[in-house]
Swiss-Prot record:
Taxonomic source organism: Mycobacterium sp. (strain JLS)
Catalyses which reaction(s): (2R,3S)-3-isopropylmalate = (2S)-2-isopropylmalate
NCBIfam families for this protein: leuD, PRK01641.1
First-level EC class: lyase
Gene Ontology, cellular component aspect: 3-isopropylmalate dehydratase complex
Superkingdom of the source species: Bacteria
Gene name linked to the record: leuD
The name this protein goes by in its record: 3-isopropylmalate dehydratase small subunit
Keywords for this protein: Amino-acid biosynthesis, Branched-chain amino acid biosynthesis, Leucine biosynthesis, Lyase
Disulfide partners: none
Pathway: Amino-acid biosynthesis; L-leucine biosynthesis; L-leucine from 3-methyl-2-oxobutanoate: step 2/4
Any single GO BP term: L-leucine biosynthetic process
InterPro entries for this protein: 3-IsopropMal_deHydase_ssu, Aconitase/3IPM_dehydase_swvl, AconitaseA/IPMdHydase_ssu_swvl, IPMI_Swivel, LeuD
Length: 197
């Protein structure tokens, strides 16, 4: 997983609340067994509407999604995070995230930046007044800069550390590879064991 320090990209105002994982990517798009190729399913039902924000330039090139409260509710669907990332999003800003979505996002490298709802409204206003506005999100300092406005965001320390280090679950496990190998060597021969690679 690529480490996340800062990201600057076009802000996309998604003025919707209670966006669940089925709206992010409908179940019909979940037939792949890989982690890539889900961008076509992102907001598929809404993208049929020509006036949907992702169909409008410059928002179609955005990488910082600014959404209403309760983003990512519904079923635990890693595909929702993968679809956002495949489309090009690196950050989702909202005043409230579903716990499962927040966890899946951090494990995959997508920053879920939680801000006050008044700050979401302010960022929406700035983006709509200046389409194409670039937003900079700094994970180290935990702030968002949109135009001349800077707002803080929250994220738990553990997820922030994983993102800063670029550690997904496999990366975390590989940090302990020598200890795992030592443990396997010491296990009694009558116990099940993994085969060497």
């Amino acid at each position: 997983m690529e480490a996340f320090r800062t990201h600057t990209g076009i802000g996309v105002p998604l003025r919707r609340s209670n966006v669940d994982t089925d709206q992010i990517i409908p179940a019909v798009y979940l037939k792949r067994v890989t982690r890539t190729g889900f961008e076509d399913g992102l907001f598929a039902a809404w993208r049929n509407d020509p006036s949907f924000v992702l169909n409008l330039p410059p928002f179609d090139r955005g990488s910082v999604l600014v959404a209403g409260p309760d983003f990512g509710t519904g079923s635990s669907r890693e595909h929702a995070v993968w679809a956002l990332m495949d489309y090009g999003f690196r950050v989702v800003i909202s005043s409230r995230f579903a716990d499962i979505f927040r966890g899946n996002a951090g494990k995959a490298g997508l920053l879920a930046a939680e801000v006050n709802q008044n700050d979401v409204e302010l960022i929406w206003k700035l983006i709509e007044q200046n389409p194409g506005l670039e937003i900079t999100v700094n994970l180290q300092d935990r702030n968002i800069i949109a135009g001349t406005v800077m707002v803080p965001f929250t994220i738990d320390d553990y997820t922030a550390w994983r993102l800063l280090e670029g550690l997904d679950d496999i990366g975390l496990t590989l940090r302990k590879q020598s200890e795992i190998e030592d443990y396997e060597r010491r296990r009694p021969s009558w116990k099940p064991r993994t085969l060497p690679v």
